[in-house]
């Protein structure tokens, strides 16, 4: 085991604080509408230019291992805030730096770190209550768009596109952001349920121009296993032919004589049919087939349930208004499923989302909810160069997360004023001793940091701006860095999602409290390895002159 380097008390805290300052100083220049960009070097390709706090934080790795500990702890604040709220990472970093700085000074002056931390936690809880009480629910299209515009640094098109996407797919719908080939923003909305499986044979195509198989008002057979034996599906095929309606078959796979017979019948015009593979793999495939069955009011034909293919009747099949199948995707529009059953299914999946600890599983479950409850929208971001596209995509991602957060927990006035005015709720809060009271005062002072930084990035004196706002009696008035005026921020559309502001403060207070209470730091000692010996000559080379 390698030898360890151990630093104690003041020496450890000073080094950790240096790391915190280096990371925070790089991140906080991006805060606010007039925040600057940061250029990130890449081992391959062009450098990346970003104004996204968490992207900057993730790139920073320091040479001194103790300074790096501080930087990595602060990076954790940005990452955690990003995971929970999707935005507010720079605000969280600025708050954490302010709390750590003041806390370290107090510890150096001889105060009890544990009582300081208790005071910080008390104050953070009180401020969160204040934010929740001031929060206003988001109701209309304009408010949703405004949250997106603010988070995307005043880019109106971004805000409008996100609001449009949300309006079309609903609050539960999935909205994804992709890079586009052109210069502009594009919005593609997929109605109904879409899954990534295309037709099994091009002979199923009904529209050769678009290379699409389209079925109007089809029956849908949902089968869990492989289909290779023709005899098992003959009875249901005959029933469908008599009904005169098209048929879509979804199964694990369809091969051999079963597929050949379907293709021949389609070409002869005896049966309008198309076949696709079932989406997903393993247990997830079965769950998705059950979703399709509920959406189309059909039954999943599974031998586990004792249903054999030979015994399937028409009333066991699902149906939909329209099905469209391309080479890659199948879209089921307007399934005949009962709304209350679909709602129950969505609730069941939601409870699975709450229970899961895996990010991947959570993402897949959320996709299933969206496909059942709303739809899928894709925002395609364009630009003149690859660097510009990536920078715009970062901003759209942030704006999308902020908008979702606003829909969940509502909005508060932006520009850092929600936190600044929350200092007034701490006036009546008293700690049990002087050290706890100092912890409360540290948070009170730190709550001014976001307003100060936004003003500073806009070229103003942060302390003067914060002082002027605190001395004023109107908690609706804030400093609008975009217009450089003091005005009613909520009325002019400068708003922040409550969830983003709340999460930023909670994560900052949590990690800052841990750093303040650190008394020793342990790192690996660099090993002095002896230089390797010169390799010996190769055999059989004797007698040669060099």
UniProtKB/Swiss-Prot annotation:
It is found in: Cytoplasm. Together with its co-chaperonin GroES, plays an essential role in assisting protein folding. The GroEL-GroES system forms a nano-cage that allows encapsulation of the non-native substrate proteins and provides a physical environment optimized to promote and accelerate protein folding. It comes from Zymomonas mobilis subsp. mobilis (strain ATCC 31821 / ZM4 / CP4). SUPFAM superfamilies: GroEL apical domain-like, GroEL equatorial domain-like, GroEL-intermediate domain like. Its EC number is 5.6.1.7. This is Chaperonin GroEL. Residues 526-546 are annotated as: Disordered. Transmembrane segments: none annotated. One of its GO terms (molecular function) is ATP binding. The gene is groEL. HAMAP family: CH60. Keywords: ATP-binding, Chaperone, Cytoplasm, Isomerase, Nucleotide-binding. ATP binds at residues 30-33, 51, 87-91, 415, 496. One of its GO terms (biological process) is protein refolding. Residues 536-546 have a biased composition (Gly residues). It catalyses: ATP + H2O + a folded polypeptide = ADP + phosphate + an unfolded polypeptide. GO terms for cellular component: cytoplasm. It is an enzyme of class 5 (isomerase). Belongs to the chaperonin (HSP60) family. Forms a cylinder of 14 subunits composed of two heptameric rings stacked back-to-back. Interacts with the co-chaperonin GroES. InterPro entries: Chaperonin_Cpn60_CS, Cpn60/GroEL, Cpn60/GroEL/TCP-1, GroEL-like_apical_dom_sf, GROEL-like_equatorial_sf, TCP-1-like_intermed_sf.
């Amino acid at each position: 085991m390698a030898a360890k380097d151990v630093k104690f008390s003041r020496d450890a805290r000073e080094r950790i604080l240096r790391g915190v300052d280096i990371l925070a100083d790089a991140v906080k220049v991006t805060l606010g509408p007039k925040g600057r960009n940061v250029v990130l070097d890449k081992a391959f390709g062009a450098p990346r230019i970003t104004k996204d706090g968490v992207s900057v934080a993730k790139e920073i790795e320091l040479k001194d291992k103790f300074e790096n500990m501080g930087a990595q702890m602060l990076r954790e604040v940005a990452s955690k805030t990003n995971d929970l709220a999707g935005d507010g990472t720079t605000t969280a970093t600025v708050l954490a730096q302010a709390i750590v700085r003041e806390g370290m000074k107090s510890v150096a002056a001889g105060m009890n770190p544990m009582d300081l931390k208790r005071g910080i936690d008390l104050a953070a809880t009180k401020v969160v209550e204040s934010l929740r009480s001031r929060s206003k629910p988001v109701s209309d299209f304009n408010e949703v768009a405004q949250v997106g515009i603010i988070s995307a640094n005043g880019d109106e098109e971004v805000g409008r596109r996100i609001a449009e996407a949300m309006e079309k797919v609903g609050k539960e719908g999935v909205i994804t952001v992709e890079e586009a080939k052109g210069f502009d923003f594009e919005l593609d909305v997929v109605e109904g349920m879409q899954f990534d499986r295309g037709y099994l044979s091009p002979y199923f195509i009904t529209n050769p121009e678009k290379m699409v198989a389209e079925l109007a008002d089809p029956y849908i057979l949902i089968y869990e296993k492989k289909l290779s034996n023709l005899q098992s599906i003959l009875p249901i095929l005959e029933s469908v032919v008599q009904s005169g309606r098209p048929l879509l078959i979804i199964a694990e796979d369809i091969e051999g004589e079963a597929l050949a017979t379907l293709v021949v019948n389609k070409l002869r015009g005896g049966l309008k049919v198309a076949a696709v593979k079932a989406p997903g793999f393993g247990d997830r495939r079965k769950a998705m087939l059950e979703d399709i069955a509920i959406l189309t009011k059909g039954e999943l034909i599974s031998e586990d349930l004792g249903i054999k293919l030979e015994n399937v009747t028409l009333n066991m099949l699902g149906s939909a208004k329209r099905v469209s199948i391309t080479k890659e995707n199948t879209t089921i529009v307007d399934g005949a499923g009962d709304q209350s059953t679909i709602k129950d299914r969505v609730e069941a999946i939601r409870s699975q989302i709450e229970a899961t600890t895996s990010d991947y599983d959570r993402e897949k479950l959320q996709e299933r909810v969206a496909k059942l409850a709303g739809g899928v929208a894709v925002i395609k971001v364009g630009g003149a160069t690859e660097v510009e596209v990536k920078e715009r995509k970062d901003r759209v991602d942030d704006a999308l997360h902020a908008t979702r957060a606003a829909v969940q927990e509502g909005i508060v006035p932006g520009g850092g004023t929600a936190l600044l005015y929350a200092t007034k709720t701490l006036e009546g809060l008293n700690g049990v001793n002087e050290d706890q009271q100092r912890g409360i005062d540290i948070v009170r002072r730190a709550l001014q940091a976001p307003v100060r930084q936004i003003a500073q990035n806009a070229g103003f004196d942060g302390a003067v701006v914060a002082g002027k706002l605190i001395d004023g009696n109107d908690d609706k008035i804030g400093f609008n860095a975009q217009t450089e005026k003091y005005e009613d921020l909520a009325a002019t559309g400068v708003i922040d999602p409550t969830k983003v502001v709340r999460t930023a403060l909670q994560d900052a207070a949590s990690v800052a409290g841990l750093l303040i209470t650190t008394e020793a730091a342990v790192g690996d000692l660099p090993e002095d390895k002896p230089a390797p010996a010169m390799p010996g000559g190769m055999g059989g080379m004797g007698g040669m002159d060099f």
